[in-house]
């Protein structure tokens, strides 16, 4: 007698529910997506105990035909695809025909629905079995209530998290729906407390304001890019506003919120050197493409997708964000808040950005955008100072020739303000005046940005600038590191450092790039070797980038080093020539502005 048997529909649905319905948030996602597929312009969500006790989704979509209502709860019954060809041109959020059957098998469900000019009906199901059907009066649309989720699967029930955690997961789902469908009025309430409410205006920025608040999204940039295959719209909250998680990056492909590591990384690469370490941006990335280029039939929950031209899309996202941010004047402004009642309390300061209009990035501009050449900077007028400390001779200042003194202020590129050097504060910050107010420049961060951009270019062309050493350097390698030297040697060779074995645990360096600091060659080589040994399976581009950042940090002016006016002037001239003068490679601000108006407010000259 054989031992293989066909499973009952009830058991098969429960097994399917294990993949489709993981938690209350899964139910909310599936039912809200069904409402959107039904053409709803308003969706209401009501929750009790974070959906574990009750979930009600109400919409004004086209509703079910009476004869389709029961069939909708049969596994793999759907109106969204008809044959295998439709599977490769999916334009709806749902298509598998599994969600309702899976949800009904692990809960108690009540469906109320009415189609235009049809009779309204109500169905009641218990563990997927129909227990009641009746006619009702209602407006066009659908209301679906799910109660006692997982009551018949105790194993799944015990793995649910706390009410707070489950509610956070639901809120995250609803936030992404709001961003993906800003033209739909979305209202969600949990035991009397509103979770989200959008106005359905069609403006993603309004949805962002509803979720994160108007103050957070001030200065949001909108950037667009196109190729033959993709249309891209990026909503980028100013780089100063960051979060501790990548979860605030929302990817929307053809109206579907998805998770994709490569696309998320492309967003972060676009913000490169503008974000502090461990911080992430708030961004909504919308992509429209031919359905043939995307496979959403990867997982029953439809969270993951496959893209046939993923690398091209990643490049488009990265370049669109990078070029958009590079065109902005991202100088934080210091604005005082209202003073506290305690007169001795110090006034708090907030930062904000001034965002300029963003031009659309066409396919040509994304791939062939010429980096504008900055105008040569002249010298600023230097007011006399009563006390100028002598410079520290150990400071490694740029080697560029110093232009002659003139009475003109610093002439810079279109993004960087014209500045007059006033002096130095605490031997760490350069104080400047400009047309709009007063500026403070972090001298270490400023030179770090200058050197980073220089080193990055130099590392990209090591073979063009190499020199033989008259006295080669010898380095001893720890036994633990010797095992990785076969991986490290190609990286060092690609940045211009030629190492040869010189004993069981020694290597000799005979060639180095000509631009290495002549008095710090040995130290620089050791630092680059250490940087390579610290990495695990790193590619050449990443190594060059990390090495440029490391060297820029270690070779730049430190805090508490006095500079004379000529050094400060030259530092600002060189900073103005960089591609992104407003942050150091680690994402910290280089320059901060106090506007004239805010200074007058601090001195109570204006109200």
Swiss-Prot record:
UniProt record similarity statement: Belongs to the DNA mismatch repair MutL/HexB family.
Pfam family, one: DNA_mis_repair
Protein name (database record): DNA mismatch repair protein MutL
PROSITE patterns: DNA_MISMATCH_REPAIR_1
CDD domains hit by this protein: HATPase_MutL-MLH-PMS-like, MutL_Trans
Keyword Zinc-finger tagged: no
Acidic residues bias: start-end ranges: 397-407
GN (gene name): mutL
InterPro entries found in the cross-reference section: DNA_mismatch_repair_CS (IPR014762), DNA_mismatch_repair_MutL (IPR020667), DNA_mismatch_S5_2-like (IPR013507), HATPase_C_sf (IPR036890), MutL/Mlh/PMS (IPR002099), MutL/Mlh/Pms-like (IPR038973), MutL_C (IPR014790), MutL_C_dimsub (IPR042120)
Disordered: annotated span: 374-411
One of the record's GO cellular component terms: mismatch repair complex
MF terms in GO: ATP binding; ATP hydrolysis activity; ATP-dependent DNA damage sensor activity; mismatched DNA binding
Top-level taxon of origin: Bacteria
Protein keywords: DNA damage, DNA repair
Function according to Swiss-Prot or TrEMBL: This protein is involved in the repair of mismatches in DNA. It is required for dam-dependent methyl-directed DNA mismatch repair. May act as a 'molecular matchmaker', a protein that promotes the formation of a stable complex between two or more DNA-binding proteins in an ATP-dependent manner without itself being part of a final effector complex.
Protein source organism: Exiguobacterium sibiricum (strain DSM 17290 / CCUG 55495 / CIP 109462 / JCM 13490 / 255-15)
GO term, biological process aspect, one: mismatch repair
């Amino acid at each position: 007698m054989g031992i293989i048997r066909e499973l009952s529909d009830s058991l098969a649905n429960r097994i399917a529910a294990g993949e489709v319905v993981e938690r209350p948030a899964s139910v909310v996602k599936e039912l809200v997506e069904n409402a959107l597929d039904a053409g709803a312009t308003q969706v209401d969500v009501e929750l009790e105990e974070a959906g574990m006790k009750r979930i009600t989704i109400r919409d004004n979509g086209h509703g079910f035909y009476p004869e389709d209502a029961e069939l909708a709860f049969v596994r793999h019954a759907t109106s969204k695809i008809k044959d295998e060809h439709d599977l490769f041109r999916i334009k709806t959020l749902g298509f598998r025909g599994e969600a309702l059957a899976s949800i009904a098998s692990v809960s108690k469900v009540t469906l109320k629905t009415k189609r235009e000019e049809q009779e309204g009906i109500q169905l009641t199901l218990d563990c997927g079995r129909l227990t009641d059907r009746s006619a009702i009066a209602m407006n066009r649309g659908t209301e679906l209530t799910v109660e006692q989720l997982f009551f018949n699967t105790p194993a799944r029930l015990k793995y649910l998290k706390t009410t707070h955690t489950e509610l956070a997961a639901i809120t995250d789902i609803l936030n992404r729906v709001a961003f993906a469908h800003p033209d739909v009025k979305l209202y969600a309430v949990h035991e009397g407390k509103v979770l989200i409410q959008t106005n359905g205006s069609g403006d993603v920025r309004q949805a962002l304001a509803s979720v994160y608040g108007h103050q957070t999204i001030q200065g949001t940039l909108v950037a667009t890019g196109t190729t033959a295959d993709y249309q891209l719209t990026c909503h980028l909250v100013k780089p100063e506003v960051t979060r501790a998680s990548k979860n605030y990056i929302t990817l929307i492909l053809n109206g579907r919120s998805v998770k994709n590591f490569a696309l998320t990384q492309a967003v972060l690469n676009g913000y490169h050197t503008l974000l502090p370490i461990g911080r992430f941006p708030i961004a909504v990335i919308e992509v429209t493409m031919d359905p043939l280029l995307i496979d959403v039939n990867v997982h029953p929950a439809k969270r993951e997708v496959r893209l046939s031209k993923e690398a091209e899309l990643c490049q488009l996202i990265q370049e669109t964000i990078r070029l958009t941010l590079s065109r902005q004047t991202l100088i934080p402004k210091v604005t005082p808040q209202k003073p506290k009642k305690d007169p001795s309390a110090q006034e708090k300061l907030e930062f904000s950005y001034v965002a300029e209009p963003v031009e659309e990035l066409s396919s040509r501009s994304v791939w062939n955008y010429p980096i504008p050449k900055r105008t040569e900077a002249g010298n600023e007028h230097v007011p006399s100072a009563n006390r100028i400390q002598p410079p520290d001779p150990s400071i490694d200042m740029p080697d560029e020739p110093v232009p002659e003194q003139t009475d003109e202020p610093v002439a810079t590129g279109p993004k960087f303000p014209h500045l007059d050097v006033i002096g130095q504060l605490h031997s760490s910050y350069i104080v400047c005046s400009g047309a709009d107010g007063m500026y403070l420049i972090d001298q270490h961060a400023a030179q770090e940005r200058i050197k980073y951009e220089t080193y990055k270019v130099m590392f990209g062309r090591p073979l063009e600038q190499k020199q033989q050493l008259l006295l080669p350097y010898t380095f001893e390698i720890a036994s633990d590191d010797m095992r990785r030297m076969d991986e490290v040697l190609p990286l060092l060779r690609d940045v211009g450092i030629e190492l040869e074995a010189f004993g069981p645990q020694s290597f000799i360096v005979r060639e180095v790039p000509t631009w290495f600091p002549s008095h710090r060659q040995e130290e620089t080589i050791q630092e680059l070797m250490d940087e390579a040994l610290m990495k695990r399976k790193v590619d050449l581009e990443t190594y060059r980038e990390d090495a440029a950042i490391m060297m820029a940090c270690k070779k730049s002016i430190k805090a508490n080093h006095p500079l004379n006016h000529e050094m400060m002037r030259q530092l600002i001239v060189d900073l103005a020539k960089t591609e992104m003068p407003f942050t150091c490679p680690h994402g910290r601000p280089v320059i901060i502005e106090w506007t004239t108006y805010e200074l007058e407010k601090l001195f109570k000259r204006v109200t």
